[in-house]
Amino acid sequence: MPGLNSVLDIGKRALFAAQSSIEVTGNNISNVNTPGYSRRSVRLEEGMSIDYAPGQMGTGVEAKEVLRHFDTFIEEQYNTKSSNRERWDTLLSNLKNLEMVFNESGEGRLNEAMSKFWKAWQTLAQSPETESTRSALLGDAETMLNAIHFADQSMNTLQRQMGDYIKQDVQRVNEIIHEIAEVNKQIDAHEIEGRNNANQLRDERSTLVRELAKKIDINYIDNGGGDITITTGAGQTLVDGTETFDIKYEGAQAFNSTIPSSDFDGSINFEGKSDYEYTFEVFEAGDVENDTASAPYPPKMKISIDGGETWLRDENGDLEFVYARDSKVTVPNSDLQIWFEDYSSGNEALEVGDKFTVVPKDGLYWYKTSSSKENITPLIKANGESHERRVSEGSLAGYFECRDHYVGRYREKMDSLSKGLVWEVNRIHSQGAGLSKFSSVTGSYSVKSDIKPLGSDSSGLDFRDKFQSA
């Protein structure tokens, strides 16, 4: 029955509600500069009513819960842009270091060394019998080689630095996803929907998600409470509630991906390093064998360096091929050699559509289970876009892109320049004569087998592709 006590109770509840609001407001003010803090407010609700004549009588106000003001849509947009920004910031800072390798403002740089080298040849051509001009050419040649070696070593150092940064990022990503899973567990333990919101834990989780987005592109799905799902931008799950899935930075390796009807039970092996990732797809079926000189020929495979989006072609626009053999075969325009072995049941037949992936470099892998993994190493397609099933944003993507797509390509061009220079200089020089006649000549290169054609992959010659039919 309404009376003085009811009035006092209404006043008491109003004071408690106001006190709660003041405390929350004070907490907001004190944390105005706290990173990751979200503004909070008290949700007030009318107290229960009592049936009484002439009508229901109210019992005042109640502070029901403390709400966290957080816009999920804006947060998702922020994390997406943060991933993109970190990728380009990482690229920018490291490409500046690459730019310094080719800075021509100092002494002994590559351009200056090459200019002196060619001038020394011109001087020698005018007076080839002079010992001093010959010595000057040798000195300038050594200077140029030192400049080339310095540039290559500097780029190699940059790539090793990228590898160290990648290791650090991978370690931190795994730490973050485990921390998020632990916070999810705590949220489930403390939160009671509509009564007790774990706002501090939610802020902590959001801060971790923001940090994760800087490392790797992510998608975030909030199913309520501690039940959230975080995947990579390509869809690989990193966090599912309290369950986690790690990523790992591992060494060079190869994978089989045969079609369902294929009985091939061997494996592809490789030797050598490359900044490319190679995909080989069987174009003409057959049995893996050693001899390519007569029919039936071994399987013929086409080659891709962008995950099978496009296929390598020669200068005439025709597809480049490599044979699938059980002896080493050199992949065109590379230092990579591949071969097939380990046939557990003797099935050496390859079918059209069988695929093999060779990653002759350190790469990034997502583990669904301890024995099931997926290659998520960032990969740039021929059109310049990132591969949709790989990591494409965040600092991890920036480091990989700098290491493989930029520094790696420059090293490839430098290597091609060096090989072309060596071949042309030696070819022209071999047509001349020294000041004294030779009594004997020993070649710098040797063949692996004296029964293999000199221009074949099996010859072992570094310049086998230079041989021409008479």
What function would you assign to each model-found segment?
Residues M1-A470:
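Structural signature of extracellular appendage/secretion-system components
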